[in-house]
Curated annotation (Swiss-Prot):
Gene symbol of the encoding locus: OR4D9
Transmembrane segments: 26-49, 58-79, 101-120, 140-158, 196-219, 236-258, 270-289
Pfam family, any one: 7tm_4
Annotated GO CC locations: plasma membrane
Family affiliation: Belongs to the G-protein coupled receptor 1 family.
Organism: Homo sapiens (Human)
Functional summary from the UniProt entry: Odorant receptor.
Extracellular membrane side: 1-25, 80-100, 159-195, 259-269
Coiled-coil annotated residue ranges, if any: none
Claim: Membrane is one of the keywords in the record: yes
Keyword terms of this UniProt record: Cell membrane, Disulfide bond, G-protein coupled receptor, Glycoprotein, Membrane, Olfaction, Receptor, Sensory transduction, Transducer, Transmembrane, Transmembrane helix
Protein name: Olfactory receptor 4D9
C-alpha cells in the first residue's frame, strides 16, 4: 500500500506501570521519593565537586558530568510517569513521543560513553600515576566529555532518523510508561523486521561490546593493583569496585531491553523502571557511601555553609 494513504496517529496511549488505583498511589509515593533523592543526591555531588578545591581532579570532574547526566536522564521519564500514575488517561503526542525518545537516547548514549571515559581515567591513574595529571588535563577531560555528548547525539539521531519515516496508522497503545524504540517500532504499519535487526545491532550489540570491554578493563586495572601496597591500593580498589557496580547496574538492564527481539515480556515493566528511574539514584549512593574522600568533602562543605549562615544571621 502507498504510505501516503496512511493517516499518521496524533498521540500514543500508555498502559502505564499498573492499572490498579491503590497500587498507583503507592508507586507514586515511592517513585516521587526516588526521583527527589536522585535530584538532590546528584546535585549535592555537583556542588561538592565544584566547591571543594581538593576534588578538582579528573576523576571527580568526570563524576560531576555523570551526575549531570543522571539528573537529566531521570527527568526524561520520571515527571511524566508521576503525572500518569495519578491520571485516568495516559497519553503523549506523537511529537512529544519522538522528543522523549530523542533525549532518552541522547542522554543514555552519553552516559554509556561517559562510563567508558571514566574507565580510561582509572586505567591512566593506575598505570601511569606520575603522568596522570598531564595526560588527563582539564582540556583533555573536557574534550572527552564533549565527545561523550556528541556520541550520544549521533546515536540518538541514528535511532530517530530510522524511526521517523515509518507510517503509524494505529493502533496507538504502548504497553509501557514511556516512549522507546522497541515499543514504538512495533506500532508501525509496515514490516519492521530489517529495521528491528538494525536497531538491535545499534543498541544491543554495542551495549554488549562496551559492557564486556569495561569489565575487561577493570579486571586489568584490578590485576595491576596487585603490585601496589598501602592506603593508595585500598582506595583504588574501592573506587574501581564502585565503578564496576555502576557499570553493571547500568548495562545489565540496557542489554536486557535492547539486545533481544522487540517482543513484550512480563518482566519488561519492572526492568524499565529500574533502568529509567532507579538506576540514576544508585550512582550517587554508590559513589558517596563507598568514597570516604567524597563524604569528608560533603561534611566540610556542610560546616562551611553552616558558618556562612551564622555570619549572615549575625
Amino acid at each position: 500500500m502507498d504510505q501516503r494513504n496512511y493517516t499518521r496517529v496524533k498521540e500514543f496511549t500508555f498502559l502505564g506501570i499498573t492499572q490498579s488505583r491503590e497500587l498507583s498511589q503507592v508507586l507514586f509515593t515511592f517513585l516521587f521519593l526516588v526521583y527527589m533523592t536522585t535530584l538532590m543526591g546528584n546535585f549535592l555531588i555537583m556542588v561538592t565537586v565544584t566547591c571543594e578545591s581538593h576534588l578538582h581532579t579528573p576523576m571527580y570532574f568526570l563524576l560531576r558530568n555523570l551526575s549531570i547526566l543522571d539528573i537529566c536522564f531521570s527527568s526524561i521519564t520520571a515527571p511524566k510517569v508521576l503525572i500518569d500514575l495519578l491520571s485516568e488517561t495516559k497519553t503523549i503526542s506523537f511529537s512529544g513521543c519522538v522528543t522523549q525518545m530523542f533525549f532518552f537516547h541522547l542522554l543514555g548514549g552519553a552516559d554509556v560513553f561517559s562510563l567508558s571515559v571514566m574507565a580510561f581515567d582509572r586505567y591512566i591513574a593506575i598505570s601511569k600515576p606520575l603522568h596522570y595529571m598531564t595526560i588527563m588535563s582539564r582540556g583533555r577531560c573536557t574534550g572527552l566529555i564533549v565527545a561523550s555528548w556528541v556520541g550520544g547525539f549521533v546515536h540518538s539521531i541514528a535511532q530517530i532518523s530510522l524511526l521517523l519515516p515509518l507510517p503509524f496508522c494505529g493502533p496507538n497503545v504502548l504497553d509501557t510508561f514511556y516512549c522507546d524504540v522497541p515499543q514504538v517500532l512495533k506500532l508501525a504499519c509496515t514490516d519492521t523486521f530489517t529495521l528491528e535487526l538494525l536497531m538491535i545491532s545499534n543498541n544491543g550489540l554495542v551495549s554488549w561490546f562496551v559492557f564486556f570491554f569495561l569489565l575487561i578493563s577493570y579486571t586489568v586495572i584490578l590485576m595491576m593493583l596487585r603490585s601496589h601496597t598501602g592506603e593508595g591500593r585500598r582506595k583504588a580498589i574501592s573506587t574501581c569496585t564502585s565503578h564496576i557496580t555502576v557499570v553493571t547496574l547500568h548495562f545489565v538492564p540496557c542489554i536486557y531491553v535492547y539486545a533481544r527481539p522487540f517482543t513484550a515480556l512480563p518482566t519488561d515493566t519492572a526492568i524499565s523502571v529500574t533502568f529509567t528511574v532507579i538506576s540514576p539514584l544508585l550512582n550517587p549512593i554508590i559513589y558517596t557511601l563507598r568514597n570516604q574522600e567524597m563524604k569528608l568533602a560533603m561534611r566540610k562543605l556542610k560546616r562551611r555553609l553552616g558558618q556562612s549562615e551564622r555570619i549572615l544571621i549575625q
